[in-house]
């Protein structure tokens, strides 16, 4: 048997190369078998792309990344046009191979020690009042990247004292307590970690992750910081049932999670997991009603909702669909 080729630092693997060695093999989708996208998922493009170009230029100038671009988010045009972006720190190469995600896999480069200062200056230049900071998984780092998160939060607040910061963190696999110790030095205003799907679908959708670990991460952060809102997000359309999603909502509340996002999974390419169904808006409304009944302080549920979509409005408790 031939040994797998050693990954070269900084080389991005995408599509078939990315998912080649995951436990549940993804069969490339044929065009004729792919579900037709319904009208409710059509995204309206802004009349002008000037603001979009400005934000992209600001990111390129400082060598920064946005998850909006790296993960091919359908809301990129709307968010960029409104002057908001979700910044992705620690590079654009992930150590995991999740087959629903369009972020590249590979062997990441060393973290950029200047990134926290560059990020803070970019946010100041863009005059942002609310930012979301996320990252790729960095299983190659002893602390999973927690110190880099803390450094970014500190530098952002030094230059932008009035800003609100939401972190969308990885699962810090095997190092939760160490990561939370570090984050306690610079806690965010909102702590977000996505469960993504129901536990029965983790093996195919989140290889390398663990449902209970993710719940424990959210719960342990809340135990340390009872006044800081915790948040999680889920996708629909990966083969789960509505009852499975309902059970996840109950688990989240049992672990003291207060904010929820629930949206439709969209297949980035034919090499990613297929969309098994497009969930009608009425079903999102039903799950929103359940979330309210369970006691979530805010639940954004709709086909185009993403974990950082209008995150500032979500944090204010305003309706987002």
Swiss-Prot record:
InterPro entries: Aldolase_TIM (IPR013785), Elp3/MiaA/NifB-like_rSAM (IPR006638), Lipoyl_synth (IPR003698), rSAM (IPR007197). [4Fe-4S] cluster 1 binds at residues 68, 73, 79, 308. The keyword Metal-binding applies. Pfam families: Radical_SAM. GO terms for molecular function: 4 iron, 4 sulfur cluster binding; lipoate synthase activity; metal ion binding. It catalyses: [[Fe-S] cluster scaffold protein carrying a second [4Fe-4S](2+) cluster] + N(6)-octanoyl-L-lysyl-[protein] + 2 oxidized [2Fe-2S]-[ferredoxin] + 2 S-adenosyl-L-methionine + 4 H(+) = [[Fe-S] cluster scaffold protein] + N(6)-[(R)-dihydrolipoyl]-L-lysyl-[protein] + 4 Fe(3+) + 2 hydrogen sulfide + 2 5'-deoxyadenosine + 2 L-methionine + 2 reduced [2Fe-2S]-[ferredoxin]. It is found in: Cytoplasm. Its EC number is 2.8.1.8. The keyword Cytoplasm applies. Its cofactor is [4Fe-4S] cluster. Binds 2 [4Fe-4S] clusters per subunit. One cluster is coordinated with 3 cysteines and an exchangeable S-adenosyl-L-methionine. This is Lipoyl synthase. It comes from Shewanella frigidimarina (strain NCIMB 400).
